[in-house]
Amino acid sequence: MERKTWETHIIQKDLILFRKFIRNVKKDGQVCFDKPFTDKANIKKYLFTGYKKSYYPDNAFDSDSERLFSIILEEDPDVIKWIKPPLNQLGLFWQAGQQYNPDFLVETTTGKYMVEVKASNEIGLDEVIAKAREGIKWCRFASMADPDKKQWEYRLIADDNIHLGNSCKYTLGTARKISED
């Protein structure tokens, strides 16, 4: 018997609304986002506060590179808004019903971006590439439905390309090129 797979893309022209997220943090685990941070091995136990451009004023991160990228987003005058989407709320599936949660959705004065930050030694993994391809498809369909008529683009950025002081545009420009195939 031959197996077939179908892709279904439903374009909703409504806003994507995110619910509140819950994250367990250690006692005294709230840190102002732009202050020096040294406990990088335990970053998942902290909540970073004081964001102005983020959908949420407080954010949690899986890596220090994600935290550094959030600072770049906050400091760049071309960035209008950004969000670190809460787990399993975007509705983006990549394999057999598994959800893909990109690290960031970013709106700048010129475009919109889905951004994934990965360790440089993980950036070529099959799973990472497969998720990136689904992100590229999502961006293509989101561009068709975007009420602002801004193009959505996917960016896969290696952690060693994230440096404070660089602009968002420069950092996005370091992204690995992925084909949609």
Residue ranges, per PLM feature:
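Intrinsically disordered, low-complexity, repeat-rich regions
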Residues: 1-98, 107-113, 118-181
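Active-site lining segments that contact anionic ligands and/or coordinate catalytic metals
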Residues: 101
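Phosphate/adenylate-binding glycine loop and adjacent helical scaffold
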Residues: 104
